[in-house]
Regions:
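N-terminal leader/transition segments
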Residues: 1-139, 147
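Gly-rich Lys/Arg/Thr-decorated short loops/hinges at beta-loop-alpha junctions or inter-strand turns
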Residues: 59-67, 81-90, 173-186, 241, ...
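A glycine-rich phosphate-binding loop feature that marks nucleotide/adenosyl-phosphate handling sites
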Residues: 102, 278-291, 324, 338-339, ...
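Ferredoxin-type iron-sulfur electron-transfer modules in oxidoreductases and energy-metabolism complexes
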Residues: 291-319, 329-330, 334-351
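Short, glycine-/Ser/Thr-/acidic-enriched flexible segments
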Residues: 101-102, 125-126, 150-151, 170, ...
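Conserved phosphate- and dinucleotide-binding cores of soluble alpha/beta proteins
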Residues: 199-200, 204-287, 292
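Generic secondary-structure signature for well-ordered alpha-helical cores
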Residues: 81, 85-93, 112, 137, ...
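Conserved alpha/beta enzyme-core scaffold
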Residues: 82, 102, 114, 120-219, ...
């Protein structure tokens, strides 16, 4: 079998030197991978179909969301300027990054200037795009992933294979074995046992963190509000416990108005995991106010281009509408068979 090697291209629309055929052949020989993929993607795909059937106007909502995103893409410069002004008016700071290296450098500089040592991260696909963890670790910072799936991958020295469920390629038995070796435990492959161990260890990390880094599902240009949806409490802890909160987001995540958020919330969880709404929906507008009891004292938003403006003027323009629900992965027979790693990029699948 061929040795698998990737030469990555940081541009969103670029093509790296990757042999999909060899990677797919490698994946096809992994019985545990096949079990994990079919179990998870089947569940999410069926869940999406069932819950969308409960929303009679689902196609109208999708069309409305498409119109909103098309408006943003047609006037992106205007909305970016409006968003930057709104964040500043709310007490936050906006930073502009053309490349992945610039984004990583900006975040490292913010951390150095504030004497940051420990950083907790909530799930962020853009941070995978920029290889942020590797960059920060090389600068001497301690970085801990706090999304359960990402935490498992960090312990395993692995990478995500799905944009919503990053550890979808591992079975609970494999995760149990990993935890037992990493933490010197004798756990059973019971989800409640595994999450209890992770919760206990991550709680300590939140208490000691000097900085929290998150992504953004959406960002409202008129108010500067960051919208973050999660099914775990890690997102809220990452944004409220550490004194410094850094948001790393692609420039395409903007929506015009805070009033547009419900349109996308009706779609995102339904399409991603078959839920009417995620467990947590966080709306963050600026740093902690004088009368507020929680929240970061500083809010920094790093807006990343990394090929997005080039995509805007290309045949790939439509990809910038993507809301990262992952439904295309869950329903794709190729992805269901070979998984995300076979594609060789940060964003796998058939979009």
């Amino acid at each position: 079998m061929k040795e698998l090697a990737i030469v990555e291209n940081d541009q969103v629309t670029g093509q790296g030197a990757w042999d999909f055929g060899a990677a797919a052949e490698h994946s096809l020989g992994d019985a545990a991978l096949k079990t994990a993929l079919l179990r998870a993607t089947g569940k999410f795909d069926i869940g999406r179909q069932e819950i969308m059937a409960e929303l009679p106007e689902s196609e109208l909502v999708r069309e409305k969301a498409r119109q909103i995103k098309d408006d943003v893409l047609a006037h992106l410069d205007t909305y970016l300027a409006r968003f930057a002004d709104s964040v500043a008016a709310a007490g936050g700071t906006v930073h502009w990054a053309t490349t992945t290296d610039e984004a990583n450098s900006i975040i490292a500089q913010i951390a150095r200037e504030r004497g940051v040592k420990r950083i907790v991260k909530s799930k962020s696909m853009v941070s995978e795009e920029t290889h942020l963890n590797k960059s920060l670790l090389s600068e001497g910072f301690q970085v801990i992933e706090t999304d359960l799936g990402e935490y498992i991958l960090q312990i395993a020295d692995d990478r995500p294979s799905h944009i919503v469920v990053p550890v979808v390629h591992k079975t609970k038995e494999q995760i149990t074995d990993l935890f037992n070796r990493a933490f010197n435990k004798k756990l059973s492959p019971v989800p409640e046992e595994l999450t209890a161990v992770a919760r206990e260890r991550l709680r300590e990390e939140f208490c000691r963190a000097d900085m929290g880094i998150t992504g953004a599902n959406f960002a409202a240009a008129d108010t500067g509000t960051i919208v973050q949806v999660t099914n775990e409490g890690n997102g809220r802890l990452s944004t409220t416990w550490p004194p410094v909160h850094v948001v790393l987001m692609g420039i395409e995540k903007l929506i015009p108005r805070l009033a547009d958020v419900p349109v996308f919330l009706k779609l995102l969880a339904r399409s991603a995991t078959g839920q009417p709404l995620t467990v947590y929906t966080n709306l963050i507008t600026g740093p902690r106010g004088h009368s507020e009891g929680d929240g970061a004292h500083e809010l920094h938003v790093v807006l990343v281009d990394n090929g997005r403006t080039a995509a805007l003027e290309s045949r790939y323009r439509e990809v910038l509408r993507c809301i990262r629900c992952g439904a295309c992965l869950n329903t794709c027979p190729v992805y269901q068979t070979v998984g995300g790693h076979a594609y060789g990029g940060v964003y796998p699948g058939p979009i």
